[in-house]
Amino acid sequence: FLSHSNFGSSKDASALKVRRARDLFRALAPDVECDGEMHGDSALSAKLRAATMPDSTLSGEANLLVCPNLDAANILFNVLKTVAGSGVTIGPMLLGAAAPAHVLTPSSTVRRLVNMTALAVDEAQVRRRTGK
């Protein structure tokens, strides 16, 4: 769970929102490893996180980055997509509504379109099967 605050270093409303989101996630999915609120570099570097927050429950590098708002998520997605070069990206996805929304941007490749379509079809099948 990403923030400008690092493990309680700020009492700002945004940092508190991220902490509440992390707590809610932990309550709903106690078996899923997560931690935060933390800086992006702490999320991606186990070595840095161990130095700054030795009690962190996250092992290794984060493989999912939860952002505090849509602006931050969009900026991060586009920066990582560019920095990663020709790596495969799946996303962005907007969660929290009655159903997930998959967003395709003008820079979407055919591969991303196929990946997002496959993901949406799988989610639709799961929703139909489970009634959720």
What are these regions (language model features)?
Residues 24-132:
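Glycine-rich phosphate/nucleotide-binding loop
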Residues 1-37, 41:
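Glycine-rich phosphate/diphosphate-binding loop of Rossmann-like nucleotide-binding domains
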